[in-house]
């Protein structure tokens, strides 16, 4: 805890309000609310926390707070601050998404659309549907049944949909405003669950076509009837009152929250939505924050009713959704069972997440244990892997990645610029890097890896063994990963003498080695590109008197490219602390080089 934070903690009031945690760059990284600012903010800097909260606290360099009149006011302010600043540690709706709706436009000739924007434009909106697939499925069925206008053709022209019976060309078919209004009412009834009239009409048309021996058209109507029936089956009726409502349940475990929402429209459960995220405050307060992020977004259509769990403050939810929505905390009966069902589903979803995570960990752990057995060595908990990268010997580099318990530990990655080798000599380059890496391990008493994997065959393995055994007197197992002619991981070499370790291509052990080889190759190539770009940049600045390495570095850091420098003014370059004479000489040289 720095001195600034310590001083500010002493000044915190006991009022309700919002607090904004900032990092060392002044960026807002977390927004929270509290009934008592003093107790809540101080809690971050006292006692122990779980891993995710410790990560948050480790990045806090400063904080601000805003006092409010009430906890509800703090809740509303928190939502607005989160939406405005999008702090990285705050919960967000998945992919920042809004939900799709089916819309009937308010036009002379109405159209059916799918939209994620709910506007006050006179259109009719039905939904929400938690994904575009569900909305598209229903719209396709509507398109087949109701011949709405689908094109932007002039009134005196017909379109493709007219020829397949899915669009009434309004002028040619002499349709009236009453006709279109009737069509709108039919769709409203259909989407509101009153589809018996439509089914009866389809059955009558099917019989009529059959009587006329038009069996293909009759089959089309039969398929439409079956499609409506299938849709009915998917939309489970959970209430007979035909009301629109959202039913919420949530569950917390291991510092994570899962919120489950049942979307009920016209008494039918049309879809559900699941969101999982880490929480940092009280579970009830973060649940309210989640609801606020959803319902304060103007793109989201509110239902007539909302059911919430019994431990959630009803007054706060009512403040979030407004007077037009009724909020209930059911205590018994069928409504209570629906909230319990949403809560149960939230628990199942979160439990499944942890089960899958544990299975993944167990699978990876099993892979490294089996790898050790196949190689005849102790389980390689820590694996260090090396790869070289250069183009015809220019800008040669090497890179090391570290996998611990089968997972990459990027904090332990290392980059090496080759210092003692000239020209394209991979073996000499690797000899230098192995020497530098493990001399430091030995000198500083660092924990050596359980296994070293070279991105290469026998030559690379032998070089590493020679340095470790004969120069450093270290006994660390070294293996090599050879690639085939398609540059794909092919086989593992290990032993003394080297032999191919038999690994099935579909085994977890092979997949682990494949990931390691891909990662070290990616890391080495990325580093090489950075060095090559920097060297190219620096070489173009050579020959300017007064422009040494430090000033070149400043130019690279601030302008990023030669083009940006060429477009800069003398004053822009002077602002970096470079004398006017040197700045002018630099721009003159770049101007000459470009001609």
From Swiss-Prot:
Function noted in UniProt: The UvrABC repair system catalyzes the recognition and processing of DNA lesions. UvrC both incises the 5' and 3' sides of the lesion. The N-terminal half is responsible for the 3' incision and the C-terminal half is responsible for the 5' incision.
GO MF terms held by the record: DNA binding; excinuclease ABC activity
rRNA processing keyword on record: no
Gene Ontology annotations of biological process type: nucleotide-excision repair; SOS response
Pfam families: GIY-YIG, HHH_5, UVR, UvrC_RNaseH, UvrC_RNaseH_dom
The family this protein is said to belong to: Belongs to the UvrC family.
Species the sequence originates in: Streptococcus thermophilus (strain ATCC BAA-491 / LMD-9)
Subunit structure: Interacts with UvrB in an incision complex.
Primary localization: cytoplasm
Residue ranges occupied by any UVR domain in the UniProt entry: 196-231
The protein's name in its UniProt record: UvrABC system protein C
Domain of life: Bacteria
Subcellular location: Cytoplasm
Gene Ontology CC terms, in alphabetical order: cytoplasm; excinuclease repair complex
Domain GIY-YIG: 14-91
Entry keyword set: Cytoplasm, DNA damage, DNA excision, DNA repair, Excision nuclease, SOS response
């Amino acid at each position: 805890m720095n001195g600034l934070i310590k001083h500010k903690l002493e000044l915190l009031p006991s009022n309700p309000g919002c607090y904004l945690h900032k990092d060392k760059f002044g960026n807002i990284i977390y927004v929270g609310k509290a009934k008592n600012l003093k107790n809540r903010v101080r809690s971050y800097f006292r006692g122990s926390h779980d891993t995710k909260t410790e990560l948050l606290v480790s990045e806090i360099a400063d904080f601000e707070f805003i006092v409010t009149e009430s906890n509800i006011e703090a809740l509303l302010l928190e939502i607005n601050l989160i939406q405005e600043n999008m702090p990285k540690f705050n919960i967000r709706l998945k992919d920042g998404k809004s939900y799709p709706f089916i819309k009937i436009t308010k036009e002379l000739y109405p159209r059916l659309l799918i939209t994620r924007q709910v506007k006050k434009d006179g259109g009719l909106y039905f939904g929400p549907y938690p994904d575009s697939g569900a909305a598209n499925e229903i719209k396709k069925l509507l398109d087949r049944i109701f011949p709405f206008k689908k094109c932007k053709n002039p009134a005196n022209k017909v379109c493709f949909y007219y020829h397949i019976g899915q669009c009434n060309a309004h002028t040619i078919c002499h349709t009236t405003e009453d006709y279109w209004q009737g069509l709108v009412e039919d769709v409203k009834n259909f989407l509101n669950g009153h589809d018996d009239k439509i089914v009866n009409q389809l059955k009558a048309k099917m019989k009529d076509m059959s009587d006329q021996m038009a069996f293909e058209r009759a089959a089309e109507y039969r398929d439409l009837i079956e499609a409506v029936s299938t849709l009915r089956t998917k939309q489970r009726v959970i209430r007979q009152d035909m009301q629109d409502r959202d039913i919420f349940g949530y569950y917390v475990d291991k510092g994570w929250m899962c919120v489950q929402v049942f979307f009920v429209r016209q008494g039918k459960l049309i879809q559900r939505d699941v969101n999982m995220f880490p929480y940092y405050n009280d579970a009830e307060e973060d649940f309210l924050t989640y609801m606020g992020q959803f319902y304060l977004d103007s793109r989201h259509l509110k239902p007539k009713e909302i059911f919430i769990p019994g431990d959630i403050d009803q007054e706060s939810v009512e403040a979030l959704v407004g007077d037009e929505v009724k909020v209930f905390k059911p205590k018994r009966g069928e409504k209570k069972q629906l909230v319990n069902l949403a809560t149960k589903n939230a628990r199942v979803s979160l439990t499944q997440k942890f089960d899958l995570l544990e299975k993944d960990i167990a699978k990876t752990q099993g892979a490294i244990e089996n790898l050790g057995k196949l190689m005849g060595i102790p389980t390689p908990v820590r694996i260090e892997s090396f790869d070289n990268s250069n183009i015809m010997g220019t800008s040669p580099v090497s890179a090391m990645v570290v996998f611990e318990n089968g997972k990459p530990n990027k904090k332990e990655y290392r980059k090496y610029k080759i210092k003692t080798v000239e020209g394209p000599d991979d073996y000499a380059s690797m000899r230098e890097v192995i020497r530098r890496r493990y001399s430091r391990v030995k000198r500083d008493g660092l924990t050596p890896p359980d296994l070293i994997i070279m991105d290469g065959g026998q030559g690379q393995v032998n070089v590493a063994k020679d340095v470790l055994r004969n120069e450093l007197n270290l006994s660390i197992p070294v293996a090599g990963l050879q690639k085939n002619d398609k540059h794909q991981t092919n086989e593992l070499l290990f032993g003394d003498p080297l032999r191919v370790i038999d690994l099935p291509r579909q085994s977890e052990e092979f997949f682990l080695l494949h990931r390691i080889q891909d990662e070290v190759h990616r890391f080495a190539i990325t580093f090489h590109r950075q060095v090559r770009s920097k060297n190219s940049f620096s070489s173009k600045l050579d020959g300017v008197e007064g422009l040494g390495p430090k000033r070149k570095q400043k130019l690279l850091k601030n302008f990023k490219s030669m083009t940006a420098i060429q477009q800069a003014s003398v004053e822009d370059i002077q602002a970096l602390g470079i004398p006017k004479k040197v700045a002018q000489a630099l721009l003159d040289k770049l101007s000459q080089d470009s001609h």
